[in-house]
Amino acid sequence: MQTPQYLQQRRKFAAAFLAFIFILAAVDTAEAGKKEKPEKKVKKSDCGEWQWSVCVPTSGDCGLGTREGTRTGAECKQTMKTQRCKIPCNWKKQFGAECKYQFQAWGECDLNTALKTRTGSLKRALHNADCQKTVTISKPCGKLTKSKPQAESKKKKKEGKKQEKMLD
């Protein structure tokens, strides 16, 4: 005769075994249900690299614009496309709108030419633009800007005139 403890253990083992068999059957069915997809053939592109034109602003000489791209290839679906682009308005356009330079301080005034010069080194080029590594710019010497104290004295004069008009 078997003890009740032994029978209880046997029932638990049988239940665990049946659960294990059920899980195996479910996994096998799920794998059988999956269809084997034929591998896609990797098609090597006969197309060349995209070559992009410079960014042409929609209006003015900076801001939003477009650029044209072309590529070669006998079996290319697309050989031309247009892309939106942007030319920053704070860049010096005389060196190319897609080239950003880091400039040094202005040099001393050359008395022979009456010009100051400074040099800029290339900081960044947009869209693989063809930019010079260094550039030099010049400007006339001697034009002094108005200092802040003069501007403050003008404000005081205007305020004084306003008060005189109010008194009249």
UniProtKB/Swiss-Prot annotation:
Keyword Secreted attached: yes
SMART domains found in the cross-reference section: PTN
GO biological process: decidualization; dendrite arborization; dendrite regeneration; estrous cycle; integrin-mediated signaling pathway; learning; leukocyte chemotaxis involved in inflammatory response; memory
Region (Chondroitin sulfate binding): 92-99, 123-131
Post-translational modification: Phosphorylated by NEK6.
Protein keywords: Disulfide bond, Growth factor, Heparin-binding, Mitogen, Secreted, Signal
Protein name, entry field: Pleiotrophin
Source species of the chain: Bos taurus
